[in-house]
């Protein structure tokens, strides 16, 4: 995942003023039939051409770097100027709570039948009432099996590393995933709201900081390839980028568990092109189109015929691609924390400020 997860409406609203002008000028004046906002590289580069060939409709794809960026724009404009938006599940949950997303017309999205049953039973949106999952996966440990001489099977392998690993480990910088490692190591929920338990996790992570090479959301896999790092916290698909370059890089979900992250697609309530937007969602859920994400960004997609169409060699090379939906579904979904997000943000600020 290339996204940031400081998941609060308050923060999104705080960003809104700064980006209000951008949101309206970048999208509202567009003459395309649809404006789609997504992370860069998260869809095929020829998506506009292929969608037009299939439907006769034109689209403009605009990119957001983080969930917070697009949330600020959406809050500033109340979603006007955008038709379809890709956001991570806690943000989809926030948008739905704010009344900003359109209920999905399943009759207009026949390819929704391609989703695994588990993908239609996600707790934040059972039945896919207002969102469809685009990609999903786990967060775990990515390591150099040729260099690490101790077992890697627990979050404590990272948080309390062997002496030989000190200064050779990295953790994700983003609030939710950084805190998740500490919470899971203590047997707590990744959505924990008890301030005392959040404080415990914070203290674990302050101690772990003393052993780290860096906090790193974007280059940890290249550090593994070079050997600068030997053990890192990683999203499963990003670990695959390292595995592609070095067969000694391995991925494991720690015995204490993982979060289940989901990136979703929503249609904005204030879209003036809802019928066309539903056609776009259906187009993405076509098995061939959805398989592109698995083949090219190496994340699992929750689309049964799409996954079944993949070369079996992918599952042999990349462990996450072999995970069944049932295996993924046993991990805990990241949820919107509401007012408790401020406790996470405060804890992370204190962790990063600690010596």
Regions found by a protein language model. Give the residues of each.
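Early extracytoplasmic/lumenal segment of secretory-pathway proteins
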Residues: 32-94
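Extracytoplasmic ligand-binding site segments that recognize negatively charged/polar headgroups
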Residues: 81-82, 86-211, 216-228
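A ligand-binding cleft/hinge motif common to bilobed small-molecule-binding domains
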Residues: 91-94, 225, 231-248
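Ligand-binding "clamshell"
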Residues: 96-103, 125-128, 241-253, 315-319
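A bilobed periplasmic-binding-protein/Venus flytrap-type ligand-binding module shared by bacterial periplasmic
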Residues: 142-147, 183-187, 262-273, 292
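Periplasmic-binding protein-like
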Residues: 198-207, 243-269
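Conserved C-terminal helix/tail region of periplasmic/extracytoplasmic solute-binding proteins
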Residues: 222, 325-355
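Mature extracytoplasmic/periplasmic domains
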Residues: 268-328
